Curated annotation (Swiss-Prot):
Residue runs in coiled coils: none
Compartments where located: Cytoplasm
Gene Ontology molecular function: any one: phosphopantetheine binding
One GO biological process term: lipid A biosynthetic process
GO cellular component: cytosol; membrane
Pathway the protein acts in: Lipid metabolism; fatty acid biosynthesis
Family indicated by similarity: Belongs to the acyl carrier protein (ACP) family.
Protein name: Acyl carrier protein
Record note on modification: 4'-phosphopantetheine is transferred from CoA to a specific serine of apo-ACP by AcpS. This modification is essential for activity because fatty acids are bound in thioester linkage to the sulfhydryl of the prosthetic group.
SUPFAM superfamilies: ACP-like
Modification sites for O-(pantetheine 4'-phosphoryl)serine: S37
Keyword vocabulary terms for this entry: Cytoplasm, Fatty acid biosynthesis, Fatty acid metabolism, Lipid biosynthesis, Lipid metabolism, Phosphopantetheine, Phosphoprotein
């Protein structure tokens, strides 16, 4: 997993309280990791803060899995 992937994984584990082994690229935040809509909003905000970028609402709606988040952040992260 890339450095960005590892940072995403850490945020997901901290915010959702899931086992690190469950945080894989194909894992759906809602279906596999038990997030609700508020959790997903909080994750997006945590990603924005950690990576110094804005995630517009239309982009946030397409970030459904851990892999989606990593791909978006690899393209858009400032740090």
């Amino acid at each position: 997993m890339s450095e960005i992937g590892e940072r995403v994984k850490k945020i997901v584990v901290e915010h959702l309280g899931v086992e690190p082994e469950k945080v894989v690229d194909a894992a759906s935040f809602i279906d596999d990791l038990g997030a609700d809509s508020l959790d997903t909003v909080e994750l997006v905000m945590a990603f924005e803060e950690e990576f110094g970028c804005e995630i517009p609402d239309d982009a946030a709606e397409t970030i459904l899995t851990v892999g989606d988040a990593v791909k978006f952040l690899e393209k858009n992260a400032k740090s």
